[in-house]
């Protein structure tokens, strides 16, 4: 428990100390008007209470990541605790805060527009397509799971297909309606349920005091079959430490923030909160695996077992609410982000419903096609999920490099994003070579290639920086 408690304290201290440090590097201007006022349109640009913006941002970026990702990552042992803490503080929170604040400074621009400003027009065009594809993947991935669970909880005639249709109808409403109509009203409630569930598990961890591994015991790889910690664990935990998906969600809330001084609690604070939730679930899952073995691969079963055992019937209800609501809410904001990215690209105003429908209908048709594939092919869903996970972390790589270029141009300490950018470049490059859905190469060779690619990218960066310094 000592390692767990120290990790928990480190996350909290990280928010107040490192968060303040990053805020100073960015240089907030509390007197500067935010896009919520300068571009107010009653649909996407709406000033909202800070507590509500925080809760929406937290739920937007969380989804099932800090629960399912942490549970899968816990199989790797104590190393998962360290990555959640170090990743959340020095990579994820910095990534989320700076991308959110740059969107705030640039009138709530979507992520591809921000990346284009600093990596060039070619990257912008590529990222427009890449990000929209990722958003549609997110929306598709986060429909099947909740629909299947709802089908099990309801009468037989209400099958998975029925619930997929219901979820998509909700998606359409949430994507089209002004941000304060559905998202602004129900998201804070779902976020509160997710937090309450995590707090309940945290309390029971201290009450039950289960035997958790300590860092002093070493960090053996406990994953069945000994899948390599690098890079597999760093992709598996995903949202619990760093996620490119977060940078696509931050512009949604950048359009609703009342003052730049609230950026740290909303962007940096949401990621730290997610890290805390991930750490709690990693600890609980470690206890579960200690008692039940490593055979269980369904994270939903682990959640159900832990909550019912520790929180009783009420905990089981909360678990169902979290497992159903979290992915659905991530899915609808993914489609909303996709709509805004396409709208920014086509310069289509979004005040009229017809203009919103013009973008939404093709996006939903693609998502439905992916869902049909995932339902017909027994491995379809797993394949979509694995490509989503890699795409998600790859997006974080592009975002971190764009942020690094911004800091260099602004004559600010760029090392705070350069180190995470290099590390995640190595992770994603190695993963695509070693993963079965990639090239399936031997791990040692994959790592050599991954690190070689990272060195080449660093060399390009240093050459560019030298030219920039001489201008």
Per-region residue spans from a language model:
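Helix-loop-helix module between adjacent transmembrane segments
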Residues: 10-11, 15, 91-107, 111-176, ...
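Extracellular loop-to-transmembrane helix junctions
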Residues: 1-19, 73-103, 112, 446-455
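Membrane-interface loop-to-helix entry segments
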Residues: 5, 9-29, 130, 146-150, ...
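Extracellular/periplasmic helix-exit of transmembrane alpha-helices
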Residues: 205-215, 261, 268-305, 375-379
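Hydrophobic, membrane-embedded alpha-helices of multi-pass small-molecule transporters
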Residues: 48-65, 204-210, 218-279, 321-330
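Flexible loop linkers connecting adjacent transmembrane helices
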Residues: 20-46, 69-72, 86, 94-123, ...
């Amino acid at each position: 428990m000592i390692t767990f408690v120290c990790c928990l304290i480190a996350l909290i201290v990280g928010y107040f100390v490192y968060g303040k440090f990053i805020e100073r590097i960015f240089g907030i201007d509390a007197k500067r008007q935010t896009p919520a006022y300068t571009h107010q349109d009653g649909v996407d640009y709406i000033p909202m209470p800070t507590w509500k913006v925080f809760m929406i941002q937290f739920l937007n970026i969380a989804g099932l990541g800090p629960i399912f990702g942490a549970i899968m990552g816990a199989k790797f042992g104590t190393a998962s605790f360290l990555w959640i803490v170090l990743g959340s503080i020095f990579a994820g929170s910095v990534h989320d805060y700076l991308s959110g604040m740059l969107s705030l400074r640039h009138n709530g621009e979507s992520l591809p527009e921000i990346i284009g400003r600093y990596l060039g027009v070619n990257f912008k065009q590529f990222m427009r397509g890449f990000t929209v594809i990722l958003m549609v993947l997110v929306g598709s991935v986060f429909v099947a799971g909740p629909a299947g669970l709802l089908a099990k909880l309801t009468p037989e005639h209400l099958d998975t297909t029925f619930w997929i249709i219901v979820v998509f109808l909700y998606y359409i409403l949430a994507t089209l309606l002004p941000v304060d109509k559905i998202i602004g009203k129900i998201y804070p409630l779902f976020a509160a349920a997710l937090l309450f569930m995590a707090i309940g598990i945290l309390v029971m961890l201290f009450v039950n005091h289960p035997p958790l591994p300590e860092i002093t015991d070493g960090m053996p790889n406990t994953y069945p079959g000994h899948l390599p910690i690098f890079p597999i664990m760093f992709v598996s935990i995903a949202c619990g430490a760093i996620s490119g998906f977060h940078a696509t969600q931050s512009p949604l809330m950048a359009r609703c923030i009342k003052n730049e001084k609230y950026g740290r609690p909303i962007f940096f604070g949401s990621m730290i909160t997610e890290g805390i939730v991930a750490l709690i679930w990693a600890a609980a899952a470690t206890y579960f695996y200690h008692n039940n073995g490593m055979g269980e691969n369904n994270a939903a079963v682990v959640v159900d077992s832990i909550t019912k055992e520790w929180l009783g019937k009420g905990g089981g209800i909360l678990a169902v609410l979290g497992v159903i609501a979290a992915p659905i809410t991530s899915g609808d904001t993914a489609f909303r982000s996709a709509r805004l990215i396409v709208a920014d690209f086509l310069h289509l105003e979004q005040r009229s419903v017809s203009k919103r429908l013009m973008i939404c209908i093709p996006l939903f048709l693609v998502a439905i096609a992916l869902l049909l594939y995932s339902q017909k092919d027994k491995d379809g869903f797993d394949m979509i999920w694995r490509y989503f996970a890699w795409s998600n972390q790859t997006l974080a790589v592009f975002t971190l490099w764009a942020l690094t270029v911004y800091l260099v141009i602004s004559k600010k300490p760029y090392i705070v994003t350069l180190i995470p950018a290099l590390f995640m470049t190595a992770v994603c490059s190695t993963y695509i070579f070693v993963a079965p859905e990639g090239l399936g190469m031997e791990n040692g060779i994959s790592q050599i290639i991954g690190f070689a690619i990272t060195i080449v990218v660093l060399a390009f960066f240093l050459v560019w920086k030298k030219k920039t310094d001489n201008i």
